[in-house]
């Protein structure tokens, strides 16, 4: 019986499914073949990935050159395992931790965005400050330090941090003279969760950036930039000084969180 493999490409700001069927390939290359699937994946990225021109400017990525180079590794008789390996290598040329190729053969991941940089973070030092009587609420770990400064460690925005969790934490820390929000080594998660936490540090609506959407197949087909605002929470808000600790291993929704927090006058970012 003929085995069918499904390859799924997950990308930043887009979710694409590339299935090994003829409906997922260019019209001029028919059939469920290695060449057809290679051409299909290359074209999907060429037309829908957001950062090709940006990455050409930053590190010289030439997507047409990538096609020429990887096409030489495709042959009609290659196994599905070898095809998956070649396609994975091609996707990794993007150097994007948000873009992975997934199939029943496994999942390819670009890890250098995380592994190639120093941690600048010590669990033992953190444990020394947290001691043993720290509090954990959802995805937040917090403590009042000896100098009456609140310390909050947010390891991930993947956990569902609710408004009740934040109310509880801020009530506990309200006696503090200031607070440290530590998001070092936070790989990201839910942007909504990150915004929910940031909303506790502003009393007014604040412009935090702009966003454009991919609108067509051209590398520069984007909508006009639209402003992005952070709204204040309707519940308890922090009114004193705050410091955000970040490092090179803070990514994705965490980057959005840090960028938002740096717009607030009572917040200082370090890292």
Kindly give the residue locations of the regions a language model identified.
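Flexible, low-complexity junctional segments that flank or bridge functional domains
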Residues: 23-213, 218-227, 241
């Amino acid at each position: 019986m003929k085995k069918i493999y499904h390859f799924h490409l997950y990308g930043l700001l887009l979710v694409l499914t590339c299935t090994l069927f003829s409906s997922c390939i260019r019209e001029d290359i028919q059939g469920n073949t290695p060449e057809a699937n290679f051409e299909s994946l290359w074209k999907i990225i060429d037309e829908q990935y957001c950062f090709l021109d940006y990455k050409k400017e930053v590190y010289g990525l030439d997507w047409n050159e990538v096609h020429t180079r990887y096409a030489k590794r495709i042959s009609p008789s290659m196994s599905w395992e070898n095809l998956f390996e070649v396609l994975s290598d091609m996707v990794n040329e993007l150097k994007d931790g948000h873009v992975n190729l997934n199939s029943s053969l496994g999942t390819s991941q670009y890890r250098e965005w995380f592994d190639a940089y120093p941690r600048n973070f010590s669990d033992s030092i953190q444990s020394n400050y947290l001691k043993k009587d720290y509090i954990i609420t959802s995805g937040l770990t917090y403590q009042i330090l000896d100098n009456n400064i609140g310390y909050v460690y947010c390891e991930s925005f993947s956990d569902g941090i609710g408004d009740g969790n934040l109310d509880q934490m801020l009530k506990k820390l309200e006696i503090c003279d200031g607070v440290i929000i530590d998001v070092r080594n936070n790989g990201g998660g839910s942007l909504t969760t990150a915004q929910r936490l940031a909303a506790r540090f502003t009393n007014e609506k604040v412009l935090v950036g702009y966003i454009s959407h991919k609108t067509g197949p051209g590398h520069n087909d984007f909508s006009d930039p639209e402003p992005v605002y952070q709204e204040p929470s309707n519940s308890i808000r922090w009114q004193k000084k705050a410091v955000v600790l970040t490092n090179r291993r803070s990514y994705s929704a965490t980057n959005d969180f840090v960028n938002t927090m740096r717009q607030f006058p009572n917040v200082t970012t370090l890292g």
